[in-house]
């Protein structure tokens, strides 16, 4: 499932939702370039007010689901060069889908020229495999967060991201 929203003040001016099928190549390849996304069913709700129409281009869309796979695309969070910039902490174990899981929370512990993430990783205790990743772009420095997601905007437009969050779930398939 994919959802993306944009607000102007307290009103939603754009809501995009879709049920998507993600076609993944084997994880041993560690390459997201050949993964594909197909929209099974979708809808988009746009504000009809002319003043709500923005010529803003953001990082996003259904294809983003391929790139936020932290296992297949470790550059996002699990790259050995990036790990020292995070503080990791073991949380209390939880049950997900009737299976025990380790929970590892992480948050930035360094100030870099770009925004980092914070969140939780869920690891199946028996299989020692990822089952879920919940993470969000740190808004500690809104300018860095804006640079991370904003691709194009009209001159003079003030743009302030409120939240950029991801939930990635992993299911075992034969």
PLM features per residue range, with description:
Residues 75-77, 89-91, 101-174:
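Gly/Pro-enriched, hydrophobic low-complexity segments
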């Amino acid at each position: 499932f994919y959802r993306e929203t944009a607000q102007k003040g307290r009103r939603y001016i754009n809501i995009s939702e879709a049920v998507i099928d993600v076609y993944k190549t084997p994880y041993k390849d560690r390459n997201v370039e050949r993964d594909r996304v197909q929209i099974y069913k979708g809808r988009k709700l746009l504000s009809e007010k002319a003043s709500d129409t923005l010529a803003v281009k953001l990082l996003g869309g259904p294809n983003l689901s391929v790139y936020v796979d932290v296992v297949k695309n470790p550059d996002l969070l699990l790259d050995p060069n990036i790990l020292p910039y995070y503080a990791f902490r073991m949380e209390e174990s939880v049950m997900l889908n009737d299976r025990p899981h380790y929970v590892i929370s992480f948050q930035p512990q360094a100030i870099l020229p770009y925004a980092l993430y914070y969140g939780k990783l869920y690891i199946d205790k028996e299989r020692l495999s990822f089952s879920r990743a919940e993470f969000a772009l740190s808004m500690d420095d809104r300018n860095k967060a804006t640079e991370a997601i904003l691709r194009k905007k009209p001159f003079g437009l003030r743009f302030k991201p409120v939240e950029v969050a991801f939930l990635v779930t992993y299911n075992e398939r034969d």
